A protein has these predicted regions:
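Short coil/linker segments at helix-helix boundaries
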Residues: 151-172, 220-233
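Beta-propeller blade signature
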Residues: 238-239
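Elongated scaffold/linker segments in the mid-to-C-terminal portions of large proteins
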Residues: 41, 80-82, 89-97, 251-444
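Sec-dependent bacterial lipoprotein signal peptides
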Residues: 1-15
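Short coil/turn linking the two alpha-helices of tandem helical-hairpin repeats
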Residues: 145-146, 150-152, 194, 212-224
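Conserved, well-structured interaction surfaces
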Residues: 38-58, 78-148, 164-197, 330, ...
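Amphipathic alpha-helical repeat scaffolds of TPR domains
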Residues: 138, 204-218
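Membrane-proximal, proline-rich intrinsically disordered regions
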Residues: 17-64
Length: 448
């Protein structure tokens, strides 16, 4: 009997040891926190997912890119049901806002930050990845705070029992202060060159401090809040650091928004890369069809300076006046011409809806901006006359929708067709979005 008892005891002991060992083994078919955050490359792989916060030109073909603008006063979308919800007083505050009040991304950043100290990284490497995590978390908090003001500040991954789930919102003062402190830490401790080309580095962090400090500083100044100078000073200091490393602006201006490759382009600090069959957008195609219905307002056009740098209301601006669109566009800042299509007229050599050829009219006014755009824009960028996504010419701008030329594309209700993202070199054949022009995220011109 003793033999049996001893044998059972030995088996139980061995089974206990085996079970303990089995329970301590990490699964080999999926990542856990213990395996996902161990080496430098682990953190690098995880951090790639955080870059998805940059919207760029969006994915596929949708109009979300312009939503903030046509809900403001710079643009309209001439489609029933898409009028400015603020101008028409139809805006509603939803009880649950999953688009803006979204802490899932904060949790993703906190998950990485919580696992840095327990990793096998060197202290310098830990500082780098802590800086990357701080950058992305601050970027998201900046977005949420700008919408809501007072919000909860969460620094660690929460559980179902975490008291923070039921805590009141933290003050804007606290959140704003924490955002700035996180970014300033990141600027001091991140690897200067980041993790290679087009990754978060010291210049990108300082570019965000510049943007954030200006926003928060001016908000506080004009809303009577304290510490405005703290944020404005931080913006200036960060801007100066960026300008020390970036000294040249790229020209022509329109290439910044219509290039297939922004790597190495002067003044581009960070951009979103698009690649065929991997990540595409439909912005260029929408501009070259009748689908977007996006156009600029007269107020937005009037905000552009004249060629001598003066606003149109200045007596010395030499503004041509409002007698016709040619006068409105003469001697203006070139950025207007790259954003709103200048006026022109040609004679088509084929049918109005399918002409692949044209002839000049011989009228100097009709050809004024055809000649100018040929001088200041590249061959496949903002040249006149314009082409739709199938390569058919439009005979005239402004092309009012009321003209009923059997061509709905490149048209507008008010005469100011927005063509900033127009080019004829990116693929526009597919309505699901196959455009691959890169989207600038941080530019030197914003810092200046």
């Amino acid at each position: 009997m003793k033999k049996y008892i001893m044998s059972i005891g030995i088996c139980l002991c061995m089974a206990s040891c085996l079970n303990d060992g089995f329970l301590d083994v990490d699964p080999k078919d999926r990542q856990t926190e213990a395996t996902a955050f161990s080496t430098y490359d682990n953190f690098k792989t995880y951090a790639w997912g955080l870059y998805n916060i940059f919207y760029g030109y969006g994915n596929d073909q949708n109009m979300n890119y312009f939503e903030d603008e046509y809900n403001a006063d710079n643009m309209i979308r001439a489609v029933s049901g898409f009028e400015s919800q603020y101008a028409y007083q139809t805006a509603r505050v939803e009880a649950t806002d999953t688009e803006h009040w979204d802490y899932k991304y904060i949790r993703r950043a906190n998950l990485m930050l919580d696992n840095i100290d327990g990793s096998s990284l060197t202290e310098t490497e830990k500082e780098h990845w802590r800086s990357v995590g701080y950058f992305f978390r601050a970027y998201k908090y900046f977005m949420i705070m700008s919408d809501f003001g007072d919000i909860p500040w969460i620094e660690h991954v929460l559980t179902d029992e975490s008291p923070e789930l039921y805590a009141p919102r933290d003050s804007r003062d606290l959140v704003a202060k924490n955002i700035l402190e996180n970014l300033q830490y990141a600027a001091q401790h991140i690897k200067a060159e980041g993790d290679g080309e087009n990754t978060i580095n010291a210049d990108v962090v300082n570019a965000l401090i510049s943007r954030y400090g200006l926003f928060e500083g001016t908000w506080r100044k004009y809303h009577g809040l304290q510490d405005a100078e703290t944020y404005l000073r931080a913006s200036v200091e960060a801007s100066e650091k960026v300008m020390a490393n970036y000294t040249t602006l790229h020209t022509p201006y329109d290439e910044l928004f219509n290039s297939e490759d922004l790597s190495g382009v002067e003044g581009i600090i960070l951009y979103k890369k698009y690649e065929t069959a991997q990540l595409c957008h439909g912005l260029t195609r929408m501009v070259r069809t009748g689908e977007s219905k996006i156009e600029m307002t007269k107020d937005a056009v009037d905000s552009y300076l004249c060629s001598n740098g003066l606003p149109i209301g200045n007596v010395n601006s030499q503004y041509g006046g409002d007698k016709d669109v040619y006068a409105q566009f003469t001697d203006r800042d070139y950025r207007l011409y790259f954003t709103v299509c200048p006026p022109y007229r040609v004679n088509l050599t084929g049918a109005a809806a399918t002409s692949t050829g044209y002839e000049l009219t011989g009228n100097a006014q009709d050809e004024q901006f055809i000649n100018l755009m040929a001088q200041i824009s590249g061959e496949t960028y903002h040249r006149l006359p314009t082409l739709n996504f199938k390569g058919f010419y439009v005979k005239e701008q402004p092309h009012f929708t009321s003209y009923n030329w059997s061509t709905a594309w490149n048209a507008s209700e008010m005469g100011f067709w927005m063509w900033k993202y127009y080019n004829i070199h990116t693929d526009c054949t597919n309505a699901t979005g196959v455009n691959t022009t890169d989207a600038p995220l941080f530019r030197l011109v914003e810092i200046l």
